[in-house]
Amino acid sequence: MAKKSMIARDVKRKKIVERYAAKRAALMAAFDAAKDPMQRLEIHRKIQALPRNSAPTRIRNRCWATGKPRGVYRDFGLCRNQLRERAHKGELPGVVKSSW
């Protein structure tokens, strides 16, 4: 189980990303459309002035059952250990053990 403070930090980051998503997208669109280097520099400074945690790349995928940050399967939102346990128990519909 991951530390509760780390899970809380990730939840906080998700909220901040949602709050600044529209502003960040507008600035990025303006940055891409700008041709003048000075104008691009000014827009880049505005993007840098946004909070660091407002960037979507700062969010870490975590297992929803244990909070572990590594080995998380996107399709299920579970870490590899939980995926294996729940698949063996039959709690994941459509998941079967492979055999060939």
UniProtKB/Swiss-Prot annotation:
Q: Could you tell me what this protein does?
A: Binds 16S rRNA, required for the assembly of 30S particles and may also be responsible for determining the conformation of the 16S rRNA at the A site.
Record the organism. Prochlorococcus marinus (strain MIT 9303)
- Record-level Gene Ontology MF annotations: rRNA binding; structural constituent of ribosome
Q: How does it assemble?
A: Part of the 30S ribosomal subunit. Contacts proteins S3 and S10.
Q: Name one GO cellular component term.
A: small ribosomal subunit
The alphabetical list of record keywords is: Ribonucleoprotein, Ribosomal protein, RNA-binding, rRNA-binding
Q: What is this protein called?
A: Small ribosomal subunit protein uS14
Give the source lineage, highest ranks first: Bacteria, Bacillati, Cyanobacteriota, Cyanophyceae, Synechococcales
The cross-references to Pfam families, in alphabetical order and at most eight, read: Ribosomal_S14
Alphabetical GO biological process terms: translation
Query: Which family is annotated?
Result: Belongs to the universal ribosomal protein uS14 family.
Keyword RNA-binding included in the entry's annotation = yes
